Structures are given as structure tokens and as C-alpha cells.
């Protein structure tokens, strides 16, 4: 069945620099909540950490992948598990969101999934370092 924007949808917001098995595990949990997921990609490609005020940073220090690369990494990663863009999920680029504010019950929840130590130990920082060491990713980007 095709993605239906009117149906209840789980949201995943992140940098996805790069998409990895931990993100896929989170996607599966989110998908189980509603049957479809909107993956939002923060517009941080190429940005080096900046002050966003209030002790937050607008981005972390290492964002080598641009939106089109992130999108393709997500599509490729989820295809390995039988998921298809436009069916179980959609991907959209969003501004560099650093805060989500709300005033009262607004009809949705925030859910933090415990994915276990093995998944939580997956590090995109270490993945990027290995990609650079092996020559897949240069130090100026991808």
C-alpha cells in the first residue's frame, strides 16, 4: 500500500550522517507504531558546528553528506530490508531544527525507544572515521 499522508505517521528527525544499522533498527520500531514513517533529514550537509543558543549547537562538527547522498543512503539501507520509499516511508529535507517546542497536549507523543546496548553502541562518528581511513570519504566531505 502507498504512503498516505492522512494516516497516522511516525516521525524520525535526524542528520543521518551516515544512515546505519542503528537507524534501521529505530525505523523498524517507528514503523511498528503506525505502519508508516516520515524520515526528516536536517539540512546540515557541509556545516561545521555553530552556536544555536541555549547551549545547543546548530549541528555537530561533522556533516560531510549532502541531502541527496543522505536520501540515497537511507533508500539503499532500507531496501536491503524490503522497505520502499513511497510505500512504508517518505523522506523530506527540513530546516536545521535544534528545538521542538509545544505548549500542551497536541495530539502526538514523543517516544524514545530502547534499542539495546548493541544498537546504541553503533557510532556514526566511528563509521565516518573508518570511511575516511579507507578512502571512501575524504576529509572535505564525501
Q: What kind of region is each of these model predictions?
A:
Residues 1-142:
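Nucleotidyltransferase catalytic core that binds NTPs
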Amino acid at each position: 500500500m502507498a504512503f498516505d499522508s492522512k494516516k497516522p505517521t511516525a516521525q524520525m528527525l535526524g542528520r543521518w550522517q551516515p544512515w546505519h544499522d542503528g537507524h534501521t533498527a529505530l525505523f523498524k520500531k517507528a514503523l511498528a507504531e503506525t505502519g508508516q514513517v516520515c524520515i526528516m533529514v536536517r539540512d546540515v550537509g557541509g556545516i561545521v558546528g555553530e552556536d544555536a543558543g541555549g547551549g545547543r549547537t546548530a549541528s555537530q562538527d561533522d556533516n560531510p553528506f549532502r541531502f541527496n547522498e543522505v536520501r540515497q543512503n537511507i533508500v539503499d539501507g532500507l531496501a536491503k530490508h524490503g522497505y520502499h520509499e513511497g510505500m512504508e516511508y517518505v523522506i523530506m529535507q527540513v530546516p536545521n531544527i535544534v528545538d521542538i517546542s509545544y505548549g500542551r497536549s497536541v495530539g502526538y507523543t514523543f517516544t524514545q525507544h530502547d534499542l539495546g546496548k548493541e544498537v546504541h553502541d553503533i557510532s556514526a562518528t566511528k563509521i565516518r572515521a573508518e570511511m575516511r581511513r579507507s578512502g571512501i570519504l575524504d576529509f572535505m566531505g564525501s
